[in-house]
Amino acid sequence: MVAPKSHTDDWAPGPFSSKPQRSQLQIFSSVLQTSLLFLLMGLRASGKDSAPTVVSGILGGSVTLPLNISVDTEIENVIWIGPKNALAFARPKENVTIMVKSYLGRLDITKWSYSLCISNLTLNDAGSYKAQINQRNFEVTTEEEFTLFVYEQLQEPQVTMKSVKVSENFSCNITLMCSVKGAEKSVLYSWTPREPHASESNGGSILTVSRTPCDPDLPYICTAQNPVSQRSSLPVHVGQFCTDPGASRGGTTGETVVGVLGEPVTLPLALPACRDTEKVVWLFNTSIISKEREEAATADPLIKSRDPYKNRVWVSSQDCSLKISQLKIEDAGPYHAYVCSEASSVTSMTHVTLLIYRRLRKPKITWSLRHSEDGICRISLTCSVEDGGNTVMYTWTPLQKEAVVSQGESHLNVSWRSSENHPNLTCTASNPVSRSSHQFLSENICSGPERNTKLWIGLFLMVCLLCVGIFSWCIWKRKGRCSVPAFCSSQAEAPADTPEPTAGHTLYSVLSQGYEKLDTPLRPARQQPTPTSDSSSDSNLTTEEDEDRPEVHKPISGRYEVFDQVTQEGAGHDPAPEGQADYDPVTPYVTEVESVVGENTMYAQVFNLQGKTPVSQKEESSATIYCSIRKPQVVPPPQQNDLEIPESPTYENFT
């Protein structure tokens, strides 16, 4: 090139000198272009003419590495080589040969284009792939290269607060970080909205925002994307991370307001020119309640979604105070009010602390007896209120000198002597909004002098009533007996065939008062062979007895005797006539009616009501019925073994 230029300068220009020169340049350019074309064709034929084709796949999905081979091309064979070694070998009209077992069932080659298809992608499948294509009647092997990237399907990005810094002008510098779980590479991050007060760093995954309480609380959204997917995060309000800039730099605690659970409360701001104020913002935890001039109070959308009660919190249009209805326990805490100017700067700040208490129920007192000895009663009392919490104060009245109070004054140990009056203790539970008390009666635990006196009086009255009852019963029974006459049977009527009684057969009768008689007729004497001189007289001797007195029949010594025995009450009777025998009692509390047919003698035996003691039996050989009268006398108690009939009884004949 240099020689022609120098040579051209020495020649003088002529009329046709320029044409030969142009034709030489054209010829040279044509030769150069032809050479470059063959060079490019050779490079393309060897497969080194272009960069690898980039292909992206999703983890667990499928991908195809395409080959642009026309249908008319005669292919001898195609070999696919993976990141480490040969993968597959394919020939026309033959089955594909898989050379790596880890790809069995996941790898395939299309029939006409010989493209490579991989399914169920894994992270190990990423890398470089090469296809060697051999054509018939063509000596050069054509190569195609691919680069495979395998990406995960992105999950929803998560935004976290990394740091908060508070400046002196009530502003906060909040740093947010966006991340996607399981995706650390090839992920691009972006934030919306883009504001002049916000800046991004670290590939867009970190956002730093500077704001004041008076600035609008805009929602920030993080978007993450990779070649196969794109996801966005939930809106994040940075105002929730900077709700107390004044207190963070040492502001005052302000006023304390006490509220009652379930009732309304007002947090005062005392701002007379509330209507002329540009904006008032109340902050509480993650809640923001703001009111702009000539507008109703608005709450953060995040607050409304969490609050089941609509319009439960609002800012008063009169003095910009914060009003809360139906207080909940979670409403307690610090509140901060900021008054803003037109330039969104803070002009004043107020702190209010809200405390919430329950109205107390009636206290419950439980007690346990420690021990009671030496006349001293010692007990432990515990006072508690259901759902009272840790803010309940307990007091005991009256409080003795020896009493011991513990566990926040809810536990009391007290003692007293049995000779002392029992103290009635009162537990009072109180909190800042309510007060309730309950009295404990200690007389129900240990017996004292008053209780002993009452016990003895009660026992005495019971004994008196019992005695009066017994005495009344005895009087009633006595009157009942005296009203019924007692008598002995008169002479029985003899049957027609029985002769009249003779002098040797006399019937005696005795009239007695106040004695019990057997109400069961005597059993007749059994018929036995007797002499003709004996008269059989049915005396029909009948005595009356209480219905509940059983009747007993008992044989004695082979004879049957019927006793009509009556004992007369009173001590003012004349002594018994001569021959009258005093008989000792026989077998008390048993009524016996005996009939004996032996020597024509019949006796009847009756018990009195007082002692239930029978009179001894007597024996006689005559056919006579006797009544015996016994005078009251003091007789020693009978012995069990002394139930014998006197050997020589004497009777008096009243005939």
Swiss-Prot record:
- What InterPro entries does its record include? CD2/SLAM_rcpt, Ig-like_dom, Ig-like_dom_sf, Ig-like_fold, Ig_sub
Q: Please name the PROSITE patterns in this protein's record.
A: IG_LIKE
**Segments for region (Disordered):** 521-556, 633-655
Keyword Mitochondrion carried by entry: no
Q: Ig-like C2-type domain: which residues?
A: 159-235, 364-452
What positions does the record give for the motif labelled ITSM 1? 601-606
Biological-process GO terms, alphabetical = cell adhesion; immune response; innate immune response; positive regulation of interleukin-17 production; T cell activation; T-helper 17 cell lineage commitment
* Span of the signal peptide: 1-47
Which ranges carry the Ig-like V-type domain?
A: 48-158, 251-363
Q: How does it assemble?
A: Interacts with SH2D1A, SH2D1B and INPP5D. Interacts (via phosphorylated cytoplasmic domain) with PTPN11; the interaction is blocked by SH2D1A.
Q: Please identify the protein, giving its name as recorded.
A: T-lymphocyte surface antigen Ly-9
- Organism phylogeny: Eukaryota, Metazoa, Chordata, Craniata, Vertebrata
